[in-house]
């Protein structure tokens, strides 16, 4: 079995979350689907989930999607041994349409360890770097540009809606005051310090950093993550053959609620998990970032069973 961690010359090192949990329902698919079938990894990252499934199912083919050039380079290196069974596409999943239906479509919605741990990507409040946060560093507005553009009330609403941050108005007021008085923040550490200062002293020493929710909100906004997820959940069932499997790993309640609702209400799908699967204690001990992961599965119904055919 391949190791799901990535250690490559690209510097992309990542431990895939819930890899075994994803592999089990894939293994339960009928052999006729897996024989020469296509798998679409909509968030390829370093290729850990895909490598595991390609290893276990030698007749499976892969199309891997990712907008992050660093991730694509790492995945290409990691998956090279699978040869022409693998195709990597530089795209956001919302802009993709497959030429043929797939037997498996999966998406891991989390920010990868390399994105969090490389300061220059600007995702981390623990490592000082530019206030960027773009998944695709060549496209779109940075977090610094976003907080500079928004009015205080707009920024507060964004932090509350996307970060579920109860101190959103206090934080937005502090950010806009700092920008007006001092100019742009020097980097992520300065913003994290400002956000932490909005909390009472005792609340700054908890397990969760005070800036966590604000940084989550800015990252979601910069990358339009929730709208992209909604569009993916609308499109993905049509990428599947009847009986095909849709697997989504989410990392916060805003994502999980959308996945749960889509799997429950979409008449093209049969929900396979009433409650999401979560990481085992052993996995959490080995990879603490798996603590918040939730995995849900659905099966594509035969066309005759969908509402359109009734």
Curated annotation (Swiss-Prot):
Q: What is its EC number?
A: 2.1.1.199
Coiled-coil residues: none
Q: Does the keyword Transferase apply?
A: yes
- Please state the protein's primary subcellular location: cytoplasm
Is Ion transport found in the keyword set?
no
**Which InterPro entries does this one have?**
RsmH, SAM-dep_MeTrfase_MraW_recog, SAM-dependent_MTases_sf
Name one molecular function that GO assigns to this entry: rRNA (cytosine-N4-)-methyltransferase activity
Pfam families of this UniProt entry? Methyltransf_5
Key words, A-Z: Cytoplasm, Methyltransferase, rRNA processing, S-adenosyl-L-methionine, Transferase
Record-linked SUPFAM superfamilies: Putative methyltransferase TM0872, insert domain (SSF81799), S-adenosyl-L-methionine-dependent methyltransferases (SSF53335)
Q: Where in the cell is it found?
A: Cytoplasm
- GO CC annotations, alphabetized: cytoplasm
Catalyzed reaction equations: cytidine(1402) in 16S rRNA + S-adenosyl-L-methionine = N(4)-methylcytidine(1402) in 16S rRNA + S-adenosyl-L-homocysteine + H(+)
Task: Tell me which PANTHER family the record gives.
Answer: 12S RRNA N4-METHYLCYTIDINE METHYLTRANSFERASE, S-ADENOSYL-METHYLTRANSFERASE MRAW
Q: What is the protein name for this chain? A: Ribosomal RNA small subunit methyltransferase H
The species is Prochlorococcus marinus (strain MIT 9303)
* Phylogenetic placement of the source organism: Bacteria, Bacillati, Cyanobacteriota, Cyanophyceae, Synechococcales
């Amino acid at each position: 079995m391949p190791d799901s961690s990535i250690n490559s010359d690209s510097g992309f090192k990542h431990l895939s979350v819930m890899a075994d949990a994803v592999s089990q329902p894939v293994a339960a698919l009928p052999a006729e689907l897996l024989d020469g079938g296509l798998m679409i990894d909509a968030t390829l990252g370093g290729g850990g989930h895909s490598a595991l499934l390609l290893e276990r199912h030698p007749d499976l083919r892969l199309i891997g999607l990712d907008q992050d050039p660093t991730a694509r380079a790492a995945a290409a290196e990691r998956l090279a041994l699978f040869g022409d069974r693998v195709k990597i596409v530089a795209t956001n999943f919302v802009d993709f349409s497959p030429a043929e239906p797939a037997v498996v479509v999966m998406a891991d919605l989390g920010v990868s360890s390399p994105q969090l741990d490389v300061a220059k990507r600007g995702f981390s409040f623990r490592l000082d770097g530019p206030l960027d946060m773009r998944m695709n560093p060549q496209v779109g507005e940075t977090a610094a540009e976003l907080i500079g553009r928004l009015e205080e009330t707009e920024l507060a609403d964004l932090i509350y809606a996307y970060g579920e941050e109860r101190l959103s108005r206090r934080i937005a007021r502090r950010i806009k005051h700092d920008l007006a008085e001092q100019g742009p923040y020097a980097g992520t550490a300065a913003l994290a310090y400002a956000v932490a200062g909005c909390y009472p002293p005792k609340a700054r020493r908890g397990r969760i950093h005070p800036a966590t929710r604000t940084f989550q909100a800015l990252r979601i906004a910069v990358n339009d993550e929730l709208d992209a997820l909604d569009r993916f959940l609308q499109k993905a069932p049509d990428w599947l053959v009847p009986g095909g499997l849709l697997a989504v790993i989410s990392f916060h309640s805003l994502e999980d609620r959308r996945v749960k609702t889509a799997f429950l209400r979409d008449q093209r799908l049969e929900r396979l998990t009433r409650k999401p699967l979560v990481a085992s204690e052993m996995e959490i001990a080995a990879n603490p970032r798996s603590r918040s992961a939730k995995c849900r599965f659905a099966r594509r119904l035969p066309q005759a069973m969908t509402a359109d055919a009734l």
